[in-house]
């Protein structure tokens, strides 16, 4: 597909992202669409969704979406490898594949094995639609982990600087470091949130401030059952965290019996 662009928008240091493809249009894909329109308004956005018919305005075929300067794979973790394999034969040689999955060891291993010479960057935005809405669109302090990439150093530096200019906090770490931290934070929050939700515990008219904070966390994750299961399945550190939690729970319960 050969499209003409009115005015390429430099992200920074001369790096031009004229078009951004988004594969997957769930809650996070929709948020990405909003953010691109906000922070890169000159860039054309092409969305591929299996649930939407291409209209040439917002939604495009996979082939058209793949011809973007950068393509974000905003798909569930379990669908990441298939999505990558489907799009690789269709992209331009310089198209940057952007991984935004919640786990990084799993997806970076796939990228190394499957992507070949295709440039990619593995990231994890540590926030989602609910956080964005609660903050009324204020992204200051929102963290984005940059875990691994195959980009030229000047391109990587330019992208990182652009994210900082938008207000995000950029955190660099290895996929292993990311997944270890995530197992002890996000996964544990999801685990406790699912337990509280399954138990039918709700807010009351005499809530303490600390209980209110707990319920804020529960309400932010209780509807993400599929993500919760995917993180447990594809993050190699979650089982150990769950074992530690269960041991600690047993110790605390015994203290109450003394």
At which residue positions do the language-model features occur?
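NAD(P)+-binding Rossmann beta1-loop-alpha1 motif at the extreme N-terminus of oxidoreductases
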Residues: 2-62
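An accessory alpha-helical subdomain
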Residues: 169-258
